[in-house]
Amino acid sequence: MRLSLWGSLLFFSFFVKHLTSLDPNTDAYHLSSFFSAMRLPNSPQAHTFSSLCSWPGVVVCDSSENVLHISASGLDLSGSIPDNTIGKMSKLQTLDLSGNKITSLPSDLWSLSLLESLNLSSNRISEPLPSNIGNFMSLHTLDLSFNSISGKIPAAISNLVNLTTLKLHNNDFQFGVPPELVHCRSLLSIDLSSNRLNESLPVGFGSAFPLLKSLNLSRNLFQGSLIGVLHENVETVDLSENRFDGHILQLIPGHKHNWSSLIHLDLSDNSFVGHIFNGLSSAHKLGHLNLACNRFRAQEFPEIGKLSALHYLNLSRTNLTNIIPREISRLSHLKVLDLSSNNLTGHVPMLSVKNIEVLDLSLNKLDGDIPRPLLEKLAMMQRFNFSFNNLTFCNPNFSQETIQRSFINIRNNCPFAAKPIITKGKKVNKKNTGLKIGLGLAISMAFLLIGLLLILVALRVRRKSRTWATKLAINNTEPNSPDQHDSTTDIKQATQIPVVMIDKPLMKMTLADLKAATFNFDRGTMLWEGKSGPTYGAVLPGGFRAALKVIPSGTTLTDTEVSIAFERLARINHPNLFPLCGYCIATEQRIAIYEDLDMVNLQSLLHNNGDDSAPWRLRHKIALGTARALAFLHHGCIPPMVHGEVKAATILLDSSQEPRLADFGLVKLLDEQFPGSESLDGYTPPEQERNASPTLESDVYSFGVVLLELVSGKKPEGDLVNWVRGLVRQGQGLRAIDPTMQETVPEDEIAEAVKIGYLCTADLPWKRPTMQQVVGLLKDISPNY
């Protein structure tokens, strides 16, 4: 290892030594300077131009000693590229610096007017793109994916009229897509996925690219309608995890269903309406179809029997009714089938079980027996779920854990095993045989009754005992106190109670793992506590970091109803919500499991951050993101979902300081009588002082308190709301501004934020704005955000 390092240093020293022998006005000199500045180990010897051009796979030159192509992918180049290096190679046509650790680009890079292909993917570039990117008039391929580039996509990109491939995915681009992009009519592939792009797409976007084969806009914040994107040449379209709305037929130009080229279509997690189009039969190459989680009208199963290439089909939460057609058995290549959360009826049809790996038919109204060939295949599948139907099954080989996870509310109709009475060498006496059978049945029934009585007694005793998690949180019990029991029986029971990990079905755990990871839910592992229960930090088996929310006991919901609620919560997806990834139902304890992404909550940011005050831009970003999350719960979910505990402690900030609202949907799992005046805090509206249940309007009030907390930097204690409202009525709202903000405070913006907080905290619920209106008001404060 030492010899190798010493050899690299010798190479590098020799490389720098001969740099001075090159003409400073040649490509050889600029290239040598580039490799030297980027600390390239094992660099090529630079004493002649030919030695540079002979380095295989990296540099290609012409006879005039011009560098035409540079391919330096994955060479561990690091740092900033200085000026007067590659930016001076005026004949350069191809530049591939992908898979390195480059942090910034030289200002003269954009002068390379002959550049045809630029690949800077998988680096560490964070600075915004300059407008002079439009100088690349000859560019065909632009790949800046997997960086941290922020700001807008510059309008000057419209100058790249020869562009065929645009890859900007997995960055931090914000705002909307520039309208000028529609002038790049040669585009074959567009990938803008996994950014923070929002607003509506430019007018004519769908029909602007007649040659387009691949479009990926997934995992952004786009809204509005999209017209004419599913034209006859397109092969791949992914619009998932956005806020697109409008009729689904608008996607089809002229409503002509000619999709002979379509291979991949994903429209999931949007708000499209209408009916699933029945013209899919022409898409004979279609292999991946995902239309899940939209707002389609009630409809029968679409025609899919001719989609022989289909290997992935997800139509969950698409409002399907009636039966699953038998023609689905023709799909012999199908690997994933998800039809969950619909209103499907009838029997489970015979499926082609040869290739299937994932099957989810849960939360429907299916009845009858599950086909035996399908049951026999389940052991070889990655994931399956038949829960919450009217189905029956018989497979004595299933473990109790499997039944509790995938057959919830499903009847096991396996008969009791009975050994036949066999008499060897003697004639059977029918009278004695009948007597023995009767006696055996009587004894069996007696044992059964005794067993049932023992179970009832055990349950009664267990109800009277103190629960292990909630009591510990409420009473602050010490780990070794006599009130806390941890008997061998408890441990045995804990190992038999499964944990359901929704997106990680192969991750097998039990309640015992959760207890071990939190030291039996010790207060020392608690992250925060609220009305919906304490939340504990844990590292689960396999190194999975989790946040475990223990919901207080006493709810009137059955285990089945709680399971349904958890499954539905797990399907709610929004960039500003902290998603549920699993759950555990343990007698009277209901545990929600979230992935702990090492986030900080807003309460800590504002009040436990010493002298390091959060700037106004960040505070506005947090307010807007939280408002969007609440607007989605109130107006994007059917039926509308009340949060019930909006406060600084339940607003988490990820690594990009994007807010994630936690604990949503848990209010349904609490007592019907929501905690009243004895648990009031500064976020509670006046009407809840009378033990009223939380409402959409009370969520708005709580958000208003959070907004005033962001503006003032004060904790919601004492009389914060009345103090700020009094200042506003006196025309002195600016006095509420947090004096610790470090930057020059845009007083006009903060004054508007104070007014929004004033509106949200109105005494009368009907005077408060909706969360949709609040989002609009916050966007108007800083329209460029």
Swiss-Prot record:
Residues 1-21 form the signal peptide. One of its GO terms (cellular component) is plasma membrane. GO terms for molecular function: ATP binding; protein kinase activity. The chain crosses the membrane at residues 437-457. Glycans are attached at N119, N162, N198, N216, N258, N314, N319, N343, N385, N390, N397. Residues 458-785 are cytoplasmic. Residues 521-785 form the Protein kinase domain. Keywords: ATP-binding, Cell membrane, Glycoprotein, Leucine-rich repeat, Membrane, Nucleotide-binding, Phosphoprotein, Receptor, Repeat, Signal, Transmembrane, Transmembrane helix. The modification Phosphotyrosine is found at Y594, Y683. The modification Phosphothreonine is found at T510, T518. It is a single-pass type I membrane protein. InterPro entries: Kinase-like_dom_sf, Leu-rich_rpt, Leu-rich_rpt_typical-subtyp, LRR_dom_sf, LRR_Rcpt-Like_S/T_Kinase, Prot_kinase_dom, Ser-Thr/Tyr_kinase_cat_dom. It is found in: Cell membrane. ATP binds at L527, W528, E529, G530, K531, S532, G533, P534, T535, K549. LRR repeats lie at residues 64-88, 89-112, 114-136, 138-160, 161-184, 186-208, 210-232, 236-258, 259-283, 284-306, 307-330, 331-355, 357-377, 379-405. Residues 22-436 are extracellular. Pfam families: LRR_1, LRR_8, PK_Tyr_Ser-Thr. Belongs to the protein kinase superfamily. Ser/Thr protein kinase family. PANTHER family: LEUCINE-RICH REPEAT-CONTAINING PROTEIN DDB_G0281931-RELATED (PTHR48006), PROTEIN KINASE DOMAIN-CONTAINING PROTEIN (PTHR48006:SF14). The protein kinase domain is predicted to be catalytically inactive. Lacks the conserved Asp active site at position 645, which is replaced by a Glu residue. This is Probably inactive leucine-rich repeat receptor-like protein kinase At5g58150. It comes from Arabidopsis thaliana. The lineage of its organism: Eukaryota, Viridiplantae, Streptophyta, Embryophyta, Tracheophyta.
